[in-house]
Curated annotation (Swiss-Prot):
Involved in the biosynthesis of ADP-glucose, a building block required for the elongation reactions to produce glycogen. Catalyzes the reaction between ATP and alpha-D-glucose 1-phosphate (G1P) to produce pyrophosphate and ADP-Glc. Pathway: Glycan biosynthesis; glycogen biosynthesis. The keyword Plastid does not apply. This is Glucose-1-phosphate adenylyltransferase. Homotetramer. It comes from Picosynechococcus sp. (strain ATCC 27264 / PCC 7002 / PR-6).
Amino acid sequence: MKRVLGIILGGGAGTRLYPLTKLRAKPAVPLAGKYRLIDIPVSNCINSEIHKIYILTQFNSASLNRHISRTYNFTGFTEGFTEVLAAQQTKENPDWFQGTADAVRQYSWLLEDWDVDEYIILSGDHLYRMDYREFIQRHRDTGADITLSVVPVGEKVAPAFGLMKIDANGRVVDFSEKPTGEALKAMQVDTQSLGLDPEQAKEKPYIASMGIYVFKKQVLLDLLKEGKDKTDFGKEIIPDAAKDYNVQAYLFDDYWADIGTIEAFYEANLGLTKQPIPPFSFYDEKAPIYTRARYLPPTKVLNADVTESMISEGCIIKNCRIHHSVLGIRTRVEADCTIEDTMIMGADYYQPYEKRQDCLRRGKPPIGIGEGTTIRRAIIDKNARIGKNVMIVNKENVEESNREELGYYIRSGITVVLKNAVIPDGTVI
């Protein structure tokens, strides 16, 4: 795969994942206790022997830059690199990135210098494990100009995706980005042609783009130069290219989740605790997911009841109950707490004993979960300070609420406590 260049799209402002994107770029959002979203496509690239990788971003990229530079530092003995390219203003391009295609266009001067045959364009907010070598080989075998990775989906989620129709040879003959109403119904197909059984085909009568593309190098450069007013791959570049180019579909038949919303992010993380076999597993030695080595001590569990949960390294868990939850690195849970259906992202550092005691003397909660606290159906962002006897249970069953001044939001009924938030003793949410 030395002839392939990887391009990962960092996405926009991450409004659907807000407030998790308040202080970080979307690809830098923590995942599964110890990873970040960006680790998924980068690891897939490395496992597929694609070692030349650019990541395009423009919002809150400081923590993403730090993570990439500390994690994916290829040695000087290979051409391999992983580099973040932030949006920039120039005389030729005075505006920020206007869309996915525009982001690639603004750096096309850099991309075209590489002596490669194909570009693989990836998204930074998906959870899946994929061998891109098979995907690229299919692209080459069919003589395609562009190949899209696709999945069959049902009617409920179909309007959120780019949908297509294909012929008997897998060629895309029609493409519609996020259709609704009659336009949606018009995109129904018999997905048995993809190998689904009749029952599955009935449940999933649409073919959706995963937002993952392989382009012949010159085809991509030509498309970007010809349509300078076209800023988005899904809405403009792909639908127009399907008319004049050989655009092929590649069926991906394993687990894949778009985790661009708070609800999808929450469900994907807690889905990792599913028994006996989760839909996605980080325990695969053949295709591991890489992240930064932090050299943390083992987790300390002191007389706790922990069931159906993932506990990351470096945690301190006292006499408490934890069920169906994910605890991130350096999470601290004090005695008599109940944590259920919750993702706790952990902390960036440990507070020394003296500082924790000083916080308690001043009436300010230290980092972690205080004694006697109950948390259900929530996401607790990093470095949050949850006081004693706090109830984070969405008592009023609120679906949406913006209480940033109090340190939390509610999204789709899920309470999201902000990074660095302070929730005082006795608070009820």
